[in-house]
Each structure stands twice: as structure tokens, then as C-alpha cells.
Amino acid sequence: SHTFLHFDTIAVYENFWILFFLLGLYLINKKWPLSSGLYMLAIFSKAFIFVFFIPTIFYIYRSEISFRKKVWTICSYVAAALLIFVIFSFGDTIYDDIILVNDSEFFLALNTLGYTLRYDVLIILSLLPLTIGLFFVSRRGILQADSILVLILTSLLAGPIISMLTDFYFVLPYRFLPLIVFVAIGIGVIFSKKD
């Protein structure tokens, strides 16, 4: 992927927010108490990741862990989100002054997706077959397929949502790194031998 090669191989763009978020998703299945802490680290690395809060809750709901662990994990994420909200609301951050809801910005930002992803032809061409493949894999009973579909959709709509809610952020190419990672994970889910 052109975007991954450009923004992940140079030191100017830090990508710890993606690393912390993906490790948090992984740890939901392995060691759930640590996952919400990594989500907090991802938020403090780049506040852009807050858009993925609801898809993360959906991922927890669809994960293959016990009901009790799901409840505790969701509670820990809600507590982490409340703690982050309190820290941002009491601190002098730039995030207080930039909230400005403008619904026309959503459609303008949605229009720029083609321009932003113009060099990632493989990602664009794989989205439709991947969506259809994940749908059929989901019908076979693999729960992760639904979660990956929601995460891919969120990755596509995160930029327009941020543009609609703020007057500060725009659709920038490095914000599509999670999309590239989730497309790769989705391809792995389709070709996995697990039934």
C-alpha cells in the first residue's frame, strides 16, 4: 500500500496510536484487563482514535470470551472513556475550542476519500470483494468477520465524522492506516481455516 509505505516507514509520522489500539483489540481476547489501558494510551497518542470507541465495544460484544469478561471489559472501556473525558474537560487542551458541528463538512470530506486513497488502488479494489467475502464468512459463524466489517466501515467514515464534528481536523492520508490494517486482517479472516 502506498499510504502504509509512505506514512509508516518514516520517523516524522508517529504511529503509536495505531499500535496501541490494535494491541488493545488483541488483548481483549487474551488479557482483557490490559486492553482498556492501551486504548487510553491510543487516545493520548492521537485523539482521533475516539471515533473507534463504539466499534471497539461491538468488537468486545462479538468476541469469543465469557459473558462475565465481556461485561467487565466493556465497563473498563466506559470507565477509561469517562476518565479521558474528565481529563480533557478539566485540562487546558486544544480540544475544547474545536468542536463545531457542520453536517455539510461530512459530505465534503466523504467526497475527498477518492482523492485521498487515489494511490491505494489495491485497497480500493479489494473493499467490495472483501465486504462480500466477510459477509459470507460471517454467515458461517465466524464472529470476527462482523467486527472487521464494522472496523473497516469506521475507518472509512472516521475522517468525514471528524470533519463534521470539528473545525480543526481534515481528511488526511495517514488516518487511513487503520483501514489498511483492517483490510489485511479481513483478508486473513476470509482465508483462515477456522470454522
Describe the predicted segments one by one.
Residues 143-165:
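Transmembrane alpha-helix segments characteristic
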Residues 50-79:
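Perimembrane helix-loop-helix junctions
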Residues 1-3, 15-22:
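Membrane-embedded helix bundles of polyisoprenyl
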Residues 21-34:
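Membrane-interface transmembrane helices that cradle and orient dolichyl/undecaprenyl
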Residues 6-14:
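Short acidic/glycine- and proline-prone juxtamembrane loop motifs at membrane-interface regions
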Residues 97-119:
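Juxtamembrane membrane-water interface segments that cap and precede transmembrane helices
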Residues 14-17, 51, 170-195:
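Hydrophobic/aromatic-rich transmembrane helices and adjacent perimembrane loops
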Residues 122-146, 160:
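Hydrophobic, aromatic-rich transmembrane alpha-helices
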